[in-house]
Amino acid sequence: MHLIDYLLLLLVGLLALSHGQLHVEHDGESCSNSSHQQILETGEGSPSLKIAPANADFAFRFYYLIASETPGKNIFFSPLSISAAYAMLSLGACSHSRSQILEGLGFNLTELSESDVHRGFQHLLHTLNLPGHGLETRVGSALFLSHNLKFLAKFLNDTMTFYEAKLFHTNFYDTVGTIQLINDHVKKETRGKIVDLVSELKKDVLMVLVNYIYFKALWEKPFISSRTTPKDFYVDENTTVRVPMMLQDQEHHWYLHDRYLPCSVLRMDYKGDTTVFFILPNQGKMGEIEEVLTPEMLMRWNNLLQKRNFYKKLELHFPKFSISGSYVLDQILPRLGFTDLFSKRADLSGITKQQKLEASKSFHKATLDVDEAGTEAAAATSFAIKFFSAQTNRHILRFNRPFLVVIFSTSTQSVLFLGKVVDPTKQ
């Protein structure tokens, strides 16, 4: 049967009242300089390609920080989900808060205008949400707004225009009803994969921002479930776990052993225009490879793996598993340049003039599942690599130790997901 892959990402940010500092309501304009325009261009000049370098830079900066603080742990997140959510939030930020958000996301505002950023995301989300054969990607946002508060029309219109956000008004004093409203929407949009995302809310919350990515794709070259058998996976020198290992031995794949770096790289394609890179460091060299893991290095590997001499027949051993990642963004992002957003210095007056808002809590959850049965699966794997050519001239790749994974949209040049699989038996 075909291997079906699901990747689901949720990011939730909560904006709550700061203590005191209430403003009298009056009509006003958002601080954003964006202007409404439908952007449908494609090719090298498309708006989404203008923001791709900054998005990639943010992805790897976020990864470095997480990896340095959680050595020996699985990592999995969607940089695109985080970037889109906070770029959308910047529509309601003013003065220093707006520039801190956009610069924290990696955008050089002397080279790229704010309008370019938002039109870039508009084009990116539109492109990813287009239907495709064998590939379904759904990227969406929702704003849950207090029914007692008057929000600026420009902020609401811009979030819908550029980020395809859906708006819901709710009574946050009815915490049970609001939690159910949020969770029901998330459950519906993720096809039931994410349930009970929000477990509690404080009564002083005025707005909840939700961003999600749902990804479902078929491998170009699927596995056969009857060939899956239990095998060892070597977490480290002292830890070995058993995992169901899939097998494929009649197909050609794109892979290389880097002559300058201690790692091997495998590229596997989904139907559609999405690709996944699996990067396997040599034994004990994970830290060395993480240090050179940059957007430029990813492009170098991608360019090399276009050459025919790297297309070879493989005996491929590939584990099936489930992992997830949960991150408290209000603790992480201040170290990436978002210095004021989660403090009383935050200026979110482009959202409403009625109350002073501050971002209180923000978290991100990502899940990745892999199996070959054609039910629910996802894109992540780990492997070790060996070469045997003396008798059969066949290369053997055994995915049996920690590796890195990058899931990449070719048409938008965007890193959709980034992670590290250290122990595939850990959720």
UniProtKB/Swiss-Prot annotation:
- Site residues by UniProt (Reactive bond): F388, S389
* Segment forming the signal sequence: 1-20
In which domain of life is the source organism classified? Eukaryota
Where do the record's glycosylation annotations fall on this chain?
A: N33, N108, N157, N238
Q: What PROSITE patterns does this protein's entry cite?
A: SERPIN
In alphabetical order, the GO MF annotations are:
serine-type endopeptidase inhibitor activity
What keywords does the record list, in alphabetical order? Glycoprotein, Protease inhibitor, Secreted, Serine protease inhibitor, Signal
A Pfam family: Serpin
Q: Could you tell me which CDD domains the record lists for this protein?
A: serpinA4_KST
Major localisation: secreted
Keyword Ribosomal protein in the entry? The reply is no
Task: State its location(s).
Answer: Secreted
Provide GO CC annotations from the record: extracellular space
Q: How does the record describe its quaternary structure? A: Monomer and some homodimers.
According to its UniProt entry, the function of this protein is described as: Inhibits human amidolytic and kininogenase activities of tissue kallikrein.
**PANTHER family per the UniProt record, alphabetical:** KALLISTATIN, SERINE PROTEASE INHIBITOR, SERPIN
- Family classification: Belongs to the serpin family.
Q: What is this protein called?
A: Kallistatin
